[in-house]
């Protein structure tokens, strides 16, 4: 493909659309990051960055964070709502609340809070969904607006801690998820002498579409029905505490792809708000929860991995709908709160790692079968001969299907003992030659050929064995078929000669990335430059900043990866600010209650029993280094 250009690479991997301008491909074919929107010309080459870290002793895989992206996401979201409020003459403000469940890493939370340090009135709060998260936000919320939203199921201790937050100077909204929580709040607030700020989560009838749609709707795990909301209002009235009810919350799901779903959800919740106001409740905050999507595949569509709207449209729709409803009911306009954690964090982190080996099909010449060979092999040779003579287009699919059928029969005959191992191997090679030849002759412009092209791309794809654990670093790719953009970090100035699939290093057949962004769609294989051990390239997994770290598990005892925080200074200099070491072997053993110290004593006993004296020190040192070492592969050259 002599006419290949960088623009082809950018379009082929759809970088321009899913990256939101933070990532790109340079004219030299290397993937870059532009983390500081104030200085868009300042770019970092990810390939060189990774090599510099390796030289400094940071082993791959490494998760690289770009905090300036977090700053930009916070401020762009606040700006979008500020502009919408001005456009529709909305009579209240907007507050962005970060739900730390999305990424609880200290660096992430602190950078999000620091993003508005220069603002006289920060538009930023924190959300907790459990007691550990609440303990964290109680210590951090004063760095922003001191607003804390408490979601999730609660016991008496959770409620006491939330009320203590009020004593510490925070504005803590305790959102009722169940009717029984109200009784606990009333009792604990009386005991502590604290007037609570109450919220309630409404269980909407409307249910948005998407992977997380069970978060909404009448069968939702969370929230109060209309009847239960009326009971809350009545009990608060009886206790002369109706003015404590200050916040209405609802949640459609974590990734709402269709803007119409958002409008419909806000419309229904807006009616709840106005009805509560009419009943005498002092509700002044309208919490739309999460739902602001991330366009993982860059298609700007209604697919589960995308979104059919932009940030401005999102803010405009919420503000517009709520303005109209409040005007219709002649109710005051409430402060708008959103909990847009996925939007804030997804783009800021990239996992970079190396390929430890590849397995690729290379066409081999095949000789005709011996005359006494089973007729099946002669049939397969005939199919191959037809292709060698350049069969017409109509015959290609028939020849391909015949070859697949013959291969299945060959496997059956081998299992019955009617085909030797050598004959089976010949049949498999003949089938691969047919597949390879057919692949080169089919045309994507022919709609009848497209399904076969997809099959062959998958069948003949190279296998890249990549130094990472899918279950640790991309758990949503395994658990819910989430798509994450994957790119070689260099060599993109040349046309991709191969297609590949990425396999992790766990001992699990599920450890494979089976969906890839390819142009304006999703494919089961990834176009890649030709691989060479003499000039290898690194692989980047993008948009992994939301949920992946905390959801990741230790399958095969592969632990947390190394991580680094990287920033571009005002003078354009790249600064690796901090490096956090990943788990050692001893660390992950400790997680499952295995004692590395006791293991070392056992090793010493075994070494003294079985190893010659002149080798003992070397063997013990190797074992000790193994316990202190990285859980990922470091020595495979």
Curated annotation (Swiss-Prot):
It comes from the Bacteria. The modification N6-(pyridoxal phosphate)lysine is found at residue 101. InterPro entries: Ala_racemase/Decarboxylase_C, Arg_decarb_HB, Arg_decarbox_C, Arg_decrbxlase, De-COase2_N, Orn/DAP/Arg_de-COase, PLP-binding_barrel. Transmembrane segments: none annotated. GO terms for molecular function: arginine decarboxylase activity; metal ion binding. It catalyses: L-arginine + H(+) = agmatine + CO2. Keywords: Decarboxylase, Lyase, Magnesium, Metal-binding, Polyamine biosynthesis, Pyridoxal phosphate, Spermidine biosynthesis. One of its GO terms (biological process) is putrescine biosynthetic process from arginine. Gene3D superfamilies: 1.10.287.3440, 1.20.58.930, Alanine racemase, Lyase, Ornithine Decarboxylase, Chain A, domain 1. Belongs to the Orn/Lys/Arg decarboxylase class-II family. SpeA subfamily. This is Biosynthetic arginine decarboxylase. It comes from Shewanella baltica (strain OS155 / ATCC BAA-1091).
